[in-house]
UniProtKB/Swiss-Prot annotation:
One annotated Gene Ontology cellular component of this protein: small ribosomal subunit
Species the sequence originates in: Metamycoplasma arthritidis (strain 158L3-1) (Mycoplasma arthritidis)
Function text: With S4 and S5 plays an important role in translational accuracy.
Record keyword Cell membrane present: no
Modified residues (3-methylthioaspartic acid): 102
Annotated family: Belongs to the universal ribosomal protein uS12 family.
Protein name: Small ribosomal subunit protein uS12
Quaternary structure (record): Part of the 30S ribosomal subunit. Contacts proteins S8 and S17. May interact with IF1 in the 30S initiation complex.
Amino acid sequence: MPTISQLINHGRSAKTSKSKAPALGMMFNSLQKKENKIPSPFKRGVCTRVATMTPKKPNSAIRKYARVRLSNGQEVTAYIPGEGHNLQEHSVVLIRGGKVKDLPGVRYTIVRGTQDAAGVDKRKQGRSIYGTKKPKEN
């Protein structure tokens, strides 16, 4: 517990909040060759590796992920949501923030239905997250 004189001399320091998706908060200026702190909700990138990973205990599955080199030069690991995907190496994707709780080191999610990432086929409910168009009713 600080004394009154300690508080007068030094005061209280504000807590610094740490970003949960730090790669979205940086922009690379290629003309000046330096990084600026300009946050964005999405970032475009190119897949450098598409692979699978097993989750932490107690879950059991084979989760798909992609290693993505972003437009700001950073390389991140992003989760591929939904059943089945068409992503390969050199596919252009859009990523957003949002971690996968049971995959360590995965802080980003690929947006389905944009760029080279196709939407999930035959999806009726919750289509917005998976980039699926509304089915035609006959």
